[in-house]
Amino acid sequence: MDPEDRPLMVMPLTEIHRQLLPHRSVAVLVYSQEGKLYLQKRSRGKRHFPGRWDISASGHVEPGQAARDTALAELSRKLNIKAEQLRFVRLLPASPGTGFEFTSIFALERVHWQPEPNQDEVEEGFFYSAEEIRYLIREFRELLTPRLVHLWETGLPFPTWGAV
């Protein structure tokens, strides 16, 4: 991707990460009816940040794939959620805080069921209030992914856009 989020070429993801090149990803924030955010604990088998708490679901956008389609696929693959409607929240620019990813943020709101994590991807997960996440970030930052901390520090995941 160039600095304006336009594709330049296709490369293996491992090489993109090694060279810290800009690329595309999605982040999905799943909210309960009470306005709590679902956090997932990444599987210990993950290459990056195993065993750390992360946002509800995320993934890389493959060449030729739409961000919304990637977000829906990640929800299904990681949390067994078959969603039809996601709300696009915003696009975060590629930066060190996003892992050099142009990140499309989506929200799935007012979920009235507990997600069922795919154990190959996610160890466990729970819904947390803004106050609980604030405490985790303040006291247990080392247990969280940099992505979760970065989103919190940019005003997500409990913004003023009314997701909850």
Question: Where are each of the predicted segments found?
Answer:
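Acidic, metal-coordinating catalytic segment for phosphate/diphosphate chemistry
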Residues: 1-27, 33
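Residue-level structural signal for beta-strand termini and adjacent loop
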Residues: 13-14, 43, 67, 121, ...
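Short, solvent-exposed loop/turn elements at beta->coil junctions and helix N-caps
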Residues: 14-17, 90-95
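Short, surface-exposed beta-strand-loop junctions and turns on beta-sheet-rich folds
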Residues: 15, 45-47, 143
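A glycine-rich, hydrophobic loop/mini-helix early in the fold
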Residues: 25-57
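The catalytic Nudix box helix
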Residues: 39, 56-89
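Nudix hydrolase/Nudix homology domain
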Residues: 51, 90, 97-164
